[in-house]
UniProtKB/Swiss-Prot annotation:
Catalytic activity: L-seryl-[protein] + ATP = O-phospho-L-seryl-[protein] + ADP + H(+); L-threonyl-[protein] + ATP = O-phospho-L-threonyl-[protein] + ADP + H(+)
Occurrences of domain Protein kinase (ranges): 91-383
Protein's name in the database: EPD1-interacting receptor-like cytoplasmic serine/threonine-protein kinase
Induction: Induced by the V.dahliae elicitor EPD1 (AC G2WWH6).
Length: 463
């Protein structure tokens, strides 16, 4: 094993500016032979970001080199900027999906009319914000990592665009957006407990895959907004711009400048810059807390003691008698008590101040999977909710439905009593009206019911 890094220029000499011809020394000949061996093994071993680091001014990786099989294989399609303008309708506001640290994201649609061999499907196109905090290096990191890594719980990178200053990435479209919006947006309905566990298991599997690679990958920016959900709430990790190659051999950590998101980063990483896979485990513990509590990692609108989620909630994770104090009130008790205890205990381990005390992500997966099979979830009352993006309307309709249920039951009881008195004892066992018929209501029923109550209230006020 060669201790020093092997210069990329020996593998792809056309990436570099021409230098004066000179004789190659025997030692360099040996390095070239080793590099050729590495190059021939690229289909077996993942290319590390450090191999193509652009820190040196003498290094320049061309588009041709990037698209060659020697770097990322032939998994990715290369799009022109004009093609991406077509599929996103010139990046129209109607197709705007959101904006992250990298830049804005727009929805588009690709098929074989754009490029031969393309599968017809919706896509998400991410455009680098030239005035933002990220740049070419983060874009290149994303291309290199996702160009080589394939897993059911990693978002699929379909292709990219590199034209002059423009840097774009084309991903599979994730219909339900990111976890952050589902948990914290006031316009989103409450995620059921079973869905939250499913998301946690999927995200954990994605991290476990990265950590278990022959050349480990440290995600470094694990958070709710980077967990994307498909139409079936299958979780996939996205945004690999800050990912780093993990330590290999006898190394215990990677020393790097502190990057990531406040509230999610592990304390030892913030203090020392020492990055390990256990740094990701800590971040996963924060997201587990968000799933349990329905609160974001940092919330300036809370009282001072509750602004940092970990500081507020972690002390209560070990005391199951206090667990109900931190459970998301929107769940309304509809969760497995045993499952909540197990998730709380796991989150407590992940958030340990000692990195060595945190579990590996593979063990996290083993702990979470059985929780998804627990069935001790209370059965709540049926509530009809009119599809709406406004939570206030949903709550109002739900309340109206409950009241309507009560009145219908009262009417049914009155009718039965009258019928019994009218027709005698032999009619007492007459089949009752179907309860299912009263379980579904149309929008019109709800509106009429609301209007009738409004008129009744007005009459009472006039009296």
């Amino acid at each position: 094993m060669v201790a020093s890094k092997i210069a990329w220029k020996f593998i792809l000499p056309n990436c570099f500016k021409a230098k004066n011809d000179r004789n190659i020394l025997p030692s360099e000949t040996k390095i070239i032979q080793i590099c050729k061996q590495i190059n021939s093994d690229h289909h077996h071993s993942r290319l590390a970001i450090s191999d193509i680091s652009t820190d040196s001014r003498s290094v320049f990786i061309s588009l041709d080199d990037l698209s060659s099989n020697a770097i990322i294989g032939s998994n990715l399609h290369i799009f022109t900027y004009a093609e991406l303008k077509i599929i996103t309708s010139k990046f129209s506001s109607a197709n705007f999906l959101g904006k992250g640290g990298f830049g804005p994201v727009h929805k588009g649609f690709i098929d074989d009319k754009i490029k031969p061999g393309l599968k017809a499907q919706p896509v998400a196109v991410k455009l680098l914000d030239l005035d933002g905090n990220q740049g070419h290096q983060e874009w290149l990191t994303e291309v290199v990592f996702l160009g080589q890594l394939r897993h059911p719980h990693l978002v699929k990178l379909i292709g990219y665009c590199w034209e002059e200053e423009q840097r774009l990435l084309v991903y599979e479209y994730m219909a339900r957006g990111n976890l952050e919006n589902h948990l914290f947006s006031r316009y989103s309905s409450c995620l059921p407990w079973s869905t939250r566990i499913k998301i946690a298991v999927g995200a954990a599997k994605g991290l476990a895959f990265l950590h278990g690679e022959e050349k480990p990958v440290i995600y470094r920016d694990f958070k709710a907004s980077n967990i994307l959900l498909d139409s079936d709430y299958k979780a996939k990790l996205s945004d690999f711009g800050l990912a780093k190659d993990g330590p290999e051999g006898d190394d215990t950590h990677v020393s790097t400048r502190v990057m990531g998101t406040h509230g999610y980063a592990a304390p030892e990483y913030i203090m020392t810059g020492h990055l390990t896979s256990k740094s990701d485990v800590y971040s996963f513990g924060v997201v587990l807390l968000e799933l349990i509590t329905g609160r974001p990692a940092m919330d300036k609108n809370r009282p001072i003691r509750e602004r940092n989620l970990v500081d507020w909630a972690r002390p209560m994770l070990r005391d199951f008698h206090k667990l109900d104090r931190i459970m998301d009130p929107r769940l309304e008790g509809q969760y497995s008590t045993e499952g909540a205890k197990k998730v709380a205990a796991l989150a407590y381990q992940c958030l340990s101040h000692q990195p060595r005390s945190r579990p590996t992500m593979s063990n996290v997966v083993k702990s979470l999977e059985p929780i998804s099979e627990l069935t001790d979830i209370p059965i709540g009352p049926f509530v009809y909710v009119v599809p709406s993006s406004e939570c206030d309307k949903e709550l109002e309709i739900g309340a109206l439905k409950s009241k309507l249920d009560e009145e219908k039951k009262m009417n049914v009881n009155e009718d039965e009593q009258k019928g019994a008195r009218r027709h005698g004892h032999r009619h007492k066992h007459r089949p009752k009206s179907s309860a299912a018929a009263a379980a579904v209501y149309s929008d019109t029923h709800m509106q009429n019911f609301a209007l009738s109550h409004e008129r009744t209230n007005k009459k009472h006020i006039l009296k």
